[in-house]
Amino acid sequence: METLRELRVNLGWTIQKLADESGITRQAISSAERGIPVRADTAKALADALSRGYGREIKPLDIKDLSII
């Protein structure tokens, strides 16, 4: 299990690239990477974008230390 930041960096993506792919703001992604809780729909959008990047399903609960409110 990897953190949001690890998943993003391993794809070679910047925060801006993940923001573009997910439709989530850079600020929200940065906050999520620092452990600040995010809404369930935000977590799903991030997981969906990462899933497309990796070519495999990633669920929000698969992302280590992602806090969901």
Describe these PLM feature segments.
Residues 1-11, 17, 21, 58-61:
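A short, Lys/Arg-rich alpha-helix, primarily the initiator
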Residues 28, 42, 62:
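Ca2+-coordinating acidic residues in Ca2+-binding motifs
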Residues 57-69:
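Short amphipathic recognition helices of helix-turn-helix/homeodomain-type DNA-binding modules
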Residues 23-38:
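Recognition helix of helix-turn-helix/homeodomain-like DNA-binding domains
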Residues 13, 24, 52, 56:
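Short glycine/serine/threonine/alanine-rich loop segments
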Residues 6-9, 27, 40:
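Hydrophobic alpha-helical segments, especially transmembrane helices
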Residues 40-58:
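DNA major-groove recognition helix of helix-turn-helix/homeodomain DNA-binding modules
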Residues 5, 16, 30, 44:
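Residues within the helices of the helix-turn-helix
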